[in-house]
UniProtKB/Swiss-Prot annotation:
The lineage of its organism: Bacteria, Thermotogati, Thermotogota, Thermotogae, Thermotogales. This is Small ribosomal subunit protein uS5. GO terms for molecular function: rRNA binding; structural constituent of ribosome. Belongs to the universal ribosomal protein uS5 family. NCBIfam families: rpsE_bact. The N-terminal domain interacts with the head of the 30S subunit; the C-terminal domain interacts with the body and contacts protein S4. The interaction surface between S4 and S5 is involved in control of translational fidelity. PROSITE patterns: RIBOSOMAL_S5, S5_DSRBD. It holds the Pfam family Ribosomal_S5.
Amino acid sequence: MSEIAEKIKQAGETFEERIIEIRRTTKVTKGGKNLSFRVLAVVGNRNGKVGVGVGKAREVPDAIRKALVSARRNIIEIPVVKGTIPHEVVGRQDAAKILMKPAAPGTGIIANGTVRAILELAGVQNVLTKAMGSTNPVIMAQATVNGVKNLYSIDKIAALRDITPAQVVRGVKKEG
């Protein structure tokens, strides 16, 4: 289990759950058709933590339970600055690509249903997105997670560059 998941159990945080997609799948065998269900679920605390999971089972309730357990196991932290993301980022997964840009207050979440659900439950209130390539919900969810994993907070950028957070925002004056 991930470190974040253990910290959440200790803190006793409450997470909101959302089912993005329930899809019926069929496997055709010589004995007939085997039906099963695939569920895509998101959990988040609307305060920078979100997880995405997929569950598969013969019955819908079992698939939902598996998807929610998977989502809780895969929780990641997202830096949220004044209700938006700190910088522009591109997330990629297979044939899907999602571009996310910070937006001014009052813009809202401009995104498709899958990306919107993930960013809402992460606590992002203003962001512009553009989905390119495949729009399969599972692939889009993974591309979104891959993108937000590459977000850095201002403090982390400052530490990597050995400057103060104020210098990251305003710029460093060149000597000479």
